[in-house]
Amino acid sequence: MSIDRKKLILEAATKSFTQFGYKATTMDLVAKLANVGKGTIYTFFKNKEELFDEIFTTLLKEMKQKADEAMEPSLPFHENVHRALFAILEFRKTHQLTIKIFQENAEIGTMAVQEVIQKMERSILSYIKSKIEDGIKSGAIKPCDPELTAFVMLKLYIALIFDWEKQHPPLDKETIAGLLELYVVKGLSAN
């Protein structure tokens, strides 16, 4: 029975954070949406931050799963990295909770929201880094600093998907894949 209540609380909190953002969500509101007493929430979660963190931990697992599902062993390394990165950023771009959190961060800059965004970025970087390490071990890519390479790849993707769209028409998936191959996989050398 208590697992059902915890699930109700998590669903209600997710709904509240998605609709109202982190700052405007209160434990009273979550209790009302979950149809439980406020005290029931505190039997599972110490505070709003812990509840928020649990929701985002689950969201990060979903994001990783989407990236894993996008990859196919028969494809070349760079194509799989592109597919995984695109899946991660598309998830981030279309998931209503992440949209709200990034919006709140831009408008208010709440500390808890900034921490969750940093956690999300670290998680994405760790995931990409592990794929780069796998690529180095398999000989698919030449030895490089996996952490730095993951950072560059992520920032390139963010720039192409989010920043470019601020002043230009959105790039399609194939164009982004081609640019990733040009700048990261092949490098800028003419050889």
Swiss-Prot record:
Keyword DNA-binding in annotation: yes
Record PROSITE patterns: HTH_TETR_1 (PS01081), HTH_TETR_2 (PS50977)
Entry's transmembrane regions: none
Pfam families associated with the record: TetR_C_24 (PF17932), TetR_N (PF00440)
Entry annotated with the keyword Transcription regulation: yes
Residue span, HTH tetR-type domain: 3-63
The protein, known as: Uncharacterized HTH-type transcriptional regulator YhgD
Protein species of origin: Bacillus subtilis (strain 168)
